[in-house]
From Swiss-Prot:
Protein name: Histone-lysine N-methyltransferase ASHH2
Assembly mode: Interacts with FRI and SUF4, two components of the transcription activator complex FRI-C, and with SWC6, a component of the SWR1 chromatin-remodeling complex. Interacts with BZR2/BES1 and IWS1.
Record keyword Methyltransferase present: yes
Family affiliation: Belongs to the class V-like SAM-binding methyltransferase superfamily. Histone-lysine methyltransferase family. SET2 subfamily.
Biased composition (Basic residues): 462-472, 758-775, 1317-1326
Top-level taxonomic group: Eukaryota
Induction context: Not regulated by vernalization.
Chief location: nucleus
Species this chain originates from: Arabidopsis thaliana (Mouse-ear cress)
Gene: ASHH2
Record SMART domains: AWS (SM00570), PostSET (SM00508), SET (SM00317)
Length: 1759
């Protein structure tokens, strides 16, 4: 059988006799074995080789070598040594052969292994020992690995070895697969080898196509499975272990093994072509040897293979499969690059056997451990192994030295001589923690060099490392516990060689791409290119220190997956846990075998065009890069020529990884990142945080401040992101011009992906920016032992690297600057975010890093802002979805992926200023952008309106009303109204006009009417509707027109729908407004219920409104339920449209809609209450998106409904009624920039209209005035027009009916912040100032305000009166127009001088008009609006004026009587409003004036007063003086107060109906204009009384009218009224300290000086107070006037003789005086007339001595 046919990669194996190939081989793990090995001084360093197919003649080629390498391996069994040493061993030639007997007992096997009865495969290890001789460059000599199985596998039903008689050899099955077609053939060489036997005690635990993993059972402990390896050459997929064999002399003489004890370099093997096979202990890890691109054999070249197979503790080898396993390409590459291969034909044949069989791209990783005592290793436990590819430690010595295989590439530590102390040339070769189980690998980016040059550099680098190494002692530790690193469950399935393409990586890739709709062109085919040499020679290995070799960091071995994985280490671990990012294997030939990014050395993302072949080498130098102002680390780049293959691999290599990762991130970047982290954590197991002491340490980062490089696609070339501290950002990164400078790179290299925040804006988003993250670094002292490459480098701050590329291939330099960076890991192509955002702290000087990363939502790392097309609020969206939103698409909040803000009712996340500040956008820039966006979006919005406006109205047809809140009523037989009609004898219909039920609007119930079936009064029940059809009625939407003639009064149809209660109605109304409902379907059913025909109804819902209707609505009682029927008001012809007046059945507070009825008496709006309506629909009915304008007080534009309208300024003329031309013919003056939809535009001087200040949240509206130009120019000065604060420019010059008195008009317009909504004209839309009404004085023109949302209850109506104005109905002219003249901005009565009089006149006329039939409909509605305006009035002066205002002549009703009469009004709304006003403002004792004659009557004295106000402000009916005719400084006498002249308050007098007062003089001081508090000085009681009576100082405007003004709010002051008689209703009893009073009362919450519950506890002093003389008492009172515990007493009504009181101690306190008249009737039991302290026995007056009331205070004291 030919070797080629059996897939043997090495033809030399055919010359070996299988009978002498092997002997019994077993591994003894007990202590005696290693003690003997140590006693011999044997220590074997690592051995590795790349397997390259060789010709058969290579074995026969013999050249005399300098030395011969002999191997001795002892095998112990049951404590006895069965090893045999060759007697011919010498110092130079040591020949060791392990001969085993034919039985298991002769093999050296431990007891534990024998009990386990496990079988282990035999292995042949090929060693290539090359030596440099006298500076000659060696040529790679290729050796091969022959995989065989021992014959003992037959016992486990393994495939039997087949002997080929023709060749005299033995063919052994590969991998134990049981398939005999592919096997390894070994020629017989009986003269060179001894007998081959196997043992039964060792069996394979796992044999897979990727390799084998096995387990040693020692003491019941199972070692870890090491990762299996794939043979890239395809020669064999399995690794087997051979027990023992002897070395032939021909091989030993061929100088294949240069294992001298004195030399540490490789032999020169230029003239040597030979293969050798050496048997090693199973504790050695067998590495598959792969060739590099040029065919050179370099054992250190592991950049393309990093598959791990760890057999602890002797061996640590880490390897990751390279994914570029296109064997056809590899075969071609090997043939071209192989040097000295005289029989490449056989190599091709050998490789062709496995064409189509790629290595498994998702190879599982295994590790194996063997419990070996620490003492046998003789090494320190804490010393980390830093070799990143493989470090093998053998307890055997070759003479006095060892073998060293240098590795100049990728900072991979070479194999070195290991002395007795476990040191490699002065460096500790042992490892601690998990690093001993898994060695760090070299970066996958590094490229192998030519064999000649790499050996030169390899030798020099190795020597330098030997000199610079530091020494460390290792603490003793239980190696058994240390080596337990892997906690993963390994697979135990046996994999055979694939016989079909199914399951192959290429096939899997194709299926995967096809399932994701990704084009697939097959695996790439390209010509191999020779890598370029390392120009820096050995400088790249400078970064090791502290005895650690660079690259010792532990790698995160990803299991299987198809996405970018992040392994994030949390917590503190002494600065030794850098960020670890693992790129998992992806099916296909696009990723490198080294799919692991080494933490602390390389940060790689799958953004490269060809991730596997693109190898850029990063070397730290001292002179490559210097920044001007920022001292940063000098970095240079070396780029391999293979990086030029990007163009070929864009579609397959990098693209596949990006597609795989991007598809996952597209779904949910946040969840995917968490998922990736979790998978990585599961792959690596639970890791300890202590890198030095724990066996499960995550990473031992020995690379100080190592460089992080990143590959990305051709567009960005090979940008460089400095150090692991920099969290990478690659796409859509905002960089400020003043912070970042781009590298010298053409714009096509990706500079367009870095937009500037101040210039580049997406049409729909505020910015394509990111939320700025900060990288924070901890600073520490410089390490004295740091590497020389870091000398002079200052501690780095947060670094942000701009990407760039030089024109040359290498070196490629990226500019590093010290700036804040964004913590987002992005894919270079699709901008997906890996959702890693956090802060990184780093000890830069030591190169040790601690990564504290927090996983956040993707929108926090990189986000943009987009405005909702419905609510116009700005929402945050991921920047990756910005590209999907263009100008033609419509975006609403429901499309937001962030569910927190996926509803228009949700408030904006941030204010506009904060958004602009976050994005670095200035206000002017934002305004300009909004204006530009408005212009761009106008056409799109109008187009979308036309498209959706054609949609038909959808509703559910029902026949009767549906009650949602209750069940339908049904009448009993006793409740049914039965008419007295009799059936007609001639068969005519009964129940005509004379029917009693018909007269009462009650339908006769079927079955109860005497007329029976001939009853005509059952129209609702029988649904006797007329015939009509639905049609499109222009701007009014759908309408209903007749298909037959109709007589007057005929029943047309019932208006049916859903019956809602008031609460449900309000909710439904807001819901419709929120959704943009534009049609009006509400109808009042009764006082508590409303019909909504919007969602459900019949054809009656399509009847439109008209201010001159031809139908009317009537309410009928049908079986106990009220039904609304529509009846004709006149004779109607066929084809005539049916209309009725919506206002008759208007729901109070319903939304107002623009009326398009076109009648001569059109009121302009339908059904809306302008005082407190929520929304006014401004758009036409045929527009699909109603123009909703929020009318509320919320200045931020986020009102109750959360819906605004975006109005633009070009179509005002189109949507204006024809009356626009009638406004004095000034249509041509409307400027283009101030036109507004549905508004009358008037051009004002340019200087008065500054540019609009627009915010992104508010609606973009530039509003104009709709007033008469003549009136503006004639009556309002230009300088005063700019001071107007009215939301509509109508208030700029609000004109009186006669159009005169410009001063009055200007004052009203500028000082009262009146917002007027003209009902006969289209409503003016403008903005409301953000300041209060008082601050608005002197403001700028309102149309240019920032706030663009109109509060509805702030908008009032003002008719535009001019000779050219259209005619309005009398009811509008008399009521609505005049009412609007009287109202202010908040809907209350304005403060103008004539407002009170006009309001009372309007109220009187409206109340009087309710008796007429024509105006009765409007009177009830108008009365409710008048009273509602009164409730909204907040000005005290206005309310007082209205209350005090009398009729124009005697006998006219007063306001009080009018309001009291309205409490018994028939209309429910008027009744409730009047009662509400009465209960709030009119006390009960004023409702019945005759009751105030009774002083102690409980109805009047203990009436419930509004608890918001101080009880002391309650009017007093006893001993109160009327308001004097003129104020006086001092009054010597006072008029006696009478109950008839009792006033509502001290400041004014309310005349009784029986005694009207004709004096209409107003007070000097107004309630809303409090006078200044007079300076506290010595005053008389009369002067205080005068001030109290006339001044009413310190009046609080929030107090109601009709009550006395409060005193100045002084903390310790109390209010008291001295009275001659005790009044039980007074709040404070005499003599009680304030602290005690507070215990019996409840002070007001808003005002501590007021009482919520006034104390009323009577004072009964017991025992009586001690006596005191009058003079002494008052002397002390005068001195302590301000410090008395009672506080200051305020006297308001009682006029007493002058008594000077000095109040100099506390000027803020009111004067405190004493009066003996208080409490004279307090003690009713004793009828005392003097205060208790005056009732003394030693005084001149006794307790029973009365004090006349007409005596002054001095006379009382001196009597």
């Amino acid at each position: 059988m030919d070797c080629k046919e059996n897939g043997v990669g090495d033809a030399s194996g055919c010359n070996i006799d299988a009978n002498s190939l092997a002997s019994n081989l077993a591994m003894n793990t007990n202590e005696d074995f290693y003690e003997k090995l140590s006693s011999r001084g044997q220590n074997l360093d690592s051995v590795s080789s790349l397997e390259i197919p060789q010709t058969a003649s290579s074995v026969n080629h013999t050249i005399e070598g300098q030395r011969k390498c002999f191997t001795e391996i002892e095998q112990m069994g049951y404590g006895n040594s069965n090893s045999q040493e060759d007697a011919g061993n010498t110092d130079d030639d040591l020949y060791v052969c392990y001969n085993a007997d034919d039985t298991q007992e002769q093999g050296v096997v431990s007891g534990e292994l024998e009990q386990s009865q496990e079988l282990i495969c035999d292995t042949d290890l090929l060693v290539n020992c090359n030596k440099l001789d006298d500076g000659k460059e060696s040529q790679d000599t290729n050796v091969s690995l022959v995989s065989i199985f021992s014959g003992s596998m037959q016992e486990k039903e393994a495939p039997q070895a087949k002997e080929d008689e023709g060749y005299g050899g033995t063919t052994l099955p590969i991998g134990g697969s049981g398939i005999d077609t592919e096997s390894t053939f070994v020629n017989d060489a009986p003269e060179q080898f001894e007998s081959l036997e196997t043992t039964k005690h060792i069996k394979p635990d796992e044999v897979e196509s990727d390799g084998i993993s096995y387990r040693f059972d020692d003491g019941g402990k199972e070692g870890r499975n090491g990762p299996s390896s794939d043979l890239d050459t395809g020669s064999s997929d399995d690794i087997s272990l051979s027990q023992s064999f002897s070395f032939p002399d021909s091989l030993l003489d061929s100088s294949v093994f240069g294992c001298s004890a004195t030399e540490s370099y490789l032999e020169d093997a230029i003239d040597i072509e030979g293969n050798g096979t050496i048997v090693v202990s199973p504790s050695l890890a067998i590495t598959e040897m792969l060739n590099n691109d040029d065919g050179g054999l370099c054992s250190h070249d592991l950049n393309k293979i990093t598959v791990t197979e760890t057999i602890n503790p002797d061996l640590k080898l880490v390897r990751e499969d390279r994914l570029d396993t296109d064997l056809s390409v590899m075969n071609e590459k090997m043939l071209k690059n192989h040097v000295g291969d005289s029989s490449s034909e056989s190599a091709v044949a050998a490789l062709s056997m496995n064409n189509g069989m790629a290595a498994d791209l998702r190879a599982e990783n295994f590790s194996q451990s063997s419990p070996i005592d620490e003492k046998t290793l003789d090494m320190e436990a804490n010393s980390p192994i830093t070799d990143s590819s493989l470090i093998w430690n053998f307890p055997l010595n070759f003479g006095s030295g060892g073998i060293e295989v240098c590795n100049p590439e990728n900072a991979v530590e070479p194999l070195r001589i290991v002395d007795d102390n476990g040191r490699i040339g002065g460096e500790v070769a042992s490892a601690s923690g998990s690093d001993f189980c898994e060695a760090g690998m070299s970066s996958s980016r590094r490229k192998a060099r030519d064999g000649k040059q790499c050996k030169v550099v390899q030798t020099k680098t190795s020597a330098r490392h030997l000199r610079k190494s530091s020494r460390k002692k290792q603490s003793e530790r239980d190696i058994e516990s240390i080596f337990k690193c892997s906690k993963q469950k390994r697979s135990s399935l046996l994999k055979t060689s694939r016989s079909s393409e199914w399951g192959l990586p290429s096939k899997t890739t194709e299926i995967f791409l096809q399932s994701n709709n990704i084009p697939y062109d097959g695996p790439p085919h390209h010509e191999p290119q020779r890598s370029q040499g390392n120009l820096n020679n050995g400088e790249h290995n400078r970064s090791s220190h502290n005895g650690n070799v660079e690259g010792s960091n532990r790698n995160i071995q990803a299991s299987s997956g198809s996405c970018l994985r992040l392994k994030v280490k949390f917590g503190k671990s002494g600065g030794q846990n850098p960020l670890n990012i693992t790129v998992s294997k992806v099916s296909g030939n696009s990723l490198p075998g080294n799919g692991i990014v080494k933490a602390g050395t390389c940060l790689e993302l799958p953004g490269s065009a060809h991730f596997g072949e693109d190898k850029m080498q990063t070397v730290e130098t001292k002179e490559d890069l210097v920044e001007k102002s920022n001292p940063v680390e000098k970095v240079s780049y070396l780029q391999s020529s293979d990086s030029m293959r990007d163009k070929k691999y864009n579609q397959d290599a990098g693209g596949l990884c990006r597609k795989v990762g991007g598809d996952v991130l597209d779904d949910d970047p946040h969840l995917s990142s968490i998922r990736m982290v979790e998978e990585c954590e599961r792959a690596t197991g639970t890791q300890s945080l202590d890198a030095e002491t724990s066996p499960d340490s995550e990473v031992i980062n020995s690379v100080p401040d190592s460089i992080v490089n990143i590959e990305h696609k051709e567009g960005l070339h090979h940008g460089f992101f400095s150090t692991p501290e920099d969290v990478v950002k690659k796409n859509r990164v905002l960089e400020k011009e003043d912070e970042l400078r781009a590298s010298k790179s053409p714009s096509e290299n990706g500079s367009h992906l870095i937009p500037n925040a101040k210039k580049a804006k997406h049409p729909k988003s505020k910015s394509n920016g990111t939320k700025k993250g900060k990288s924070k670094f901890s600073e520490s002292a410089k390490d004295g032992r740091k590497n020389e490459s870091h000398e002079g480098v200052e501690q780095r701050k947060s670094l942000n690297t701009s990407m760039g590329r030089d024109d040359s291939d290498y070196p490629e330099v990226g500019r590093i600057e010290s700036h804040k960076t964004t913590g987002a890991l992005l894919d270079a192509d699709i901008g997906k975010t890996s959702a890693t955002y956090g802060t990184i702290s780093s000890d830069v000087t030591h190169g040790e890093m601690v990564v504290d990363v927090t996983i956040e939502d993707s929108y926090s790392t990189e986000s943009a802002w987009v405005r909702c097309d419905d609510c116009f609020k700005w929402r945050r969206i991921p920047a990756s979805v910005v590209g999907s939103i263009d100008e033609s698409s419509r975006w609403i909040c429901m499309n937001n992926s962030d569910k927190r803000f996926a509803d228009c009712s949700k408030s904006q996340e941030m204010s506009n200023e904060e958004i602009n500040e976050e994005l670095g956008i200035g206000q002017d820039e934002a305004d300009a952008y909004d204006c530009d966006a408005a212009k761009r979006g106008k056409e799109k919005e109008q187009k979308s309106k036309r498209l959706t406006g054609k949609q038909k109205a959808c509703f559910k047809a029902i026949k009767t009303n549906q009650f949602l809140h209750r069940n339908r009523k049904s009448q009993t037989i006793d409740e049914i109204m039965v008419c007295h009609c009799k059936p007609s004898p001639d068969g005519r219909l009964g129940c005509g006009e004379e029917c009693l039920n018909r007269m009462l609007n009650i339908e006769c119930l079927q079955g109860t009417c005497p007329a029976g079936d001939l009853c005509s009064n059952q129209q609702f029940q029988k649904r006797k509707y007329v015939k009509f059809e639905r049609f499109q009625s222009g701007k009014k939407g759908y309408g209903l027109r007749l298909l037959e003639d109709v007589r007057e009064g005929q029943f047309l149809i019932e208006y049916v729908g859903e019956v809602l209660d008031m609460q449900s109605y309000e909710t439904r109304q807001k819901e419709y407004a929120f959704k943009g409902q534009k049609h009006f379907y509400f109808m009042t059913l009764n006082g508590n219920e409303v019909i909504d025909a919007g969602a459900k109804g019949n054809l009656g819902r399509f009847i439109n409104h008209s201010c001159e209707p031809n139908c009317r609505t009537e309410k009928w009682m049908v079986n106990g339920e009220i039904c609304v029927g529509i009846f004709s008001m006149q004779d109607l012809k066929k084809g005539q449209e049916l209309t009725f007046d919506y206002n008759y059945v208007r729901v109070f507070g319903a939304a107002a809609k623009k009326c398009y009825c076109g009648s001569s008496h059109c009121r302009g709006y339908i059904g809306g209450d302008p005082l407190n309506g929520d929304v006014i629909i401004q758009s036409d009915s045929d527009e699909e998106y109603p123009e909703l304008v929020i009318l509320d007080d919320d200045e931020s534009g986020e009102g109750i409904l959360g819906a605004t309208s975006r109005t633009f300024t070009d179509d005002a003329d189109e949507q204006m009624p024809q009356s626009f031309e009638k406004v004095n013919g000034y249509k041509d003056l409307a400027p283009d920039n101030t036109q507004t939809q549905s508004s009358v535009s008037v051009k004002l001087p340019e200087r008065e209209i500054p540019p609009p200040l627009l915010q992104p949240t508010e609606v973009l509206k530039e509003l104009s005035s709709g007033i008469s130009i003549t009136a503006v120019q004639q009556e309002v000065p230009a300088e005063k027009k700019t001071k107007s604060t009215s939301p509509t420019s109508s208030s700029l010059s609000r004109m009186s009916p006669g159009g005169t008195n410009s001063d009055k008009t200007t004052k009203h317009g500028s000082g009262e912040d009146k917002k007027i909504l003209p009902r006969p004209r289209p409503r003016m839309k403008t903005s409301r100032s953000s300041e209060s009404s008082k601050r608005d004085k002197g403001g700028i023109y309102p149309g240019v305000n920032k706030a663009q949302v109109i509060p509805v209850n702030k908008l009032q109506q003002q008719p535009i009166k001019s000779k050219g104005s259209e005619k309005v109905s009398p009811s509008i002219e008399t009521f609505e127009g005049k009412l609007n003249e009287l109202l202010d901005a908040v809907g209350g009565i304005s403060k103008r001088r004539d407002s009170a009089k006009g309001y009372l006149k309007l109220l009187l006329l409206t109340a009087a008009s309710r008796g007429t039939d024509e105006e009765g409909i409007y009177s009830n509605r108008d009365l409710s609006m008048i009273l509602d305006a009164l409730l909204k009035t907040k000005s005290k002066s206005v309310l007082v004026d209205i209350i005090n205002k009398n009729g124009p002549f005697a006998g006219m009703e007063s306001f009080k009587d009018s309001v009291l009469s309205f409490t018994e009004h028939d209309d429910y709304t008027v009744h409730n409003i009047a009662r509400s006003f009465r209960d709030r403002w009119i006390p009960k004792h004023f409702r019945k004036p005759w009751r105030i004659n009774r002083e102690e009557r409980s109805e009047s004295m203990r009436s419930p007063i509004n608890r918001r106000f101080r009880a002391s402000q309650e009017p007093r009916y006893d001993h109160q003086s009327p308001r004097p005719a003129e104020p006086a400084a001092s009054v010597t006498s006072s008029k006696a107060a009478t109950p008839e002249t009792a006033s509502v308050s001290e400041g004014y007098s309310e005349p009784n109906s029986g005694l009207p007062e004709t004096n209409g003089r107003k007070r000097k001081s107004r309630w809303d204009q409090p006078s200044k508090t007079k300076e506290q000085r010595i005053m008389t009681i009369l002067s205080q009384q005068t001030d109290e009576t006339n001044g009413n100082q310190d009046v609080q405007d929030d107090l109601p009218p009709g009550f006395s003004s409060p005193c100045t709010d002084v903390p310790d002051a109390i209010t008291a009224q001295p009275q001659q008689k005790f009044l039980s209703r007074l709040p404070v009893s005499y003599g009680i300290p304030l602290s005690i009073v507070h215990q019996f009362g409840s002070p007001g919450k808003e005002d501590p000086t007021t009482w919520s519950v006034a104390p009323g506890m009577p004072f009964y002093p017991f025992p009586p107070l001690p006596p005191v003389s009058h003079g002494e008492f008052f002397a002390k009172r005068n001195v302590r006037a301000c410090s008395s515990s009672m506080g200051n007493l305020t006297y308001s009504n009682e006029i007493l003789p002058a008594t000077p009181v000095t109040d100099s101690t506390a000027p803020t306190r009111k004067r405190e005086l004493f009066s003996s008249d208080i409490g004279t009737t307090y003690f009713r039991q004793q009828k005392q007339s003097v205060p208790p302290w005056l009732r003394n026995n030693g005084g001149e007056k006794t307790a029973n001595s009365p004090i006349p009331g007409n005596l002054t205070l001095e006379k009382k004291l001196n009597s």
